[in-house]
Amino acid sequence: MTPAFSYPEPQPEWPSWYSEYRYGAFYLFPPPDVMHRVNALRSHYDPTSAAICEAHVSLTVPLPRPLDVATLAHVTECLAAQPAFSLEWGPPRVYPGVPGVVLDIAPMERVSALVAALEGCPCFRGAAPRRYAFSPHMTIAEFVSEARTQEILAEVRELGLHGAWWCSEVVYAIPDAAFRFHERWRGRLGSQQGEG
């Protein structure tokens, strides 16, 4: 099968976890106003993460192989069968078990159903299992110490970081040779009464 996209060759300086993401994964990207606001926080508090990817909600484990036209068509059908929904973001909290500050994402049930549908597609056959239970979030800072985590949380807690957006699209993003993720494709969720 011919890949639907071009993919980077693993670079000698890449740590092993970079190579796991060579074929990308699926994400939710916030609308421009939320993206701008969260990107500014990421750049300030965790420039390492900010350099890798813009603000996002990680959905799936990394793809184990390139996407081809046939499997991309299957993903398109899968997404069309999932209803669009109102996604709530914020407030900030500490990510459980590891240092870092994230924005909560809800409703858990709707996002989890979307993940289960995506990871049930043929393109995920043979994918490495998820290391931790799925917990939807949008990261502000992750490559920080425990002490810095508490400082960041105290600073951002009063910024009114919460809201909602109409979640109607899923993004497929792939890293480049410098391990900077770029959007390569968007798939639409099915319509739902009240959309607009």
Can you name each region flagged by the protein language model?
Residues 1-196:
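Histidine-dependent nucleotide/RNA phosphoesterase domain, centered on the 2H-phosphoesterase fold
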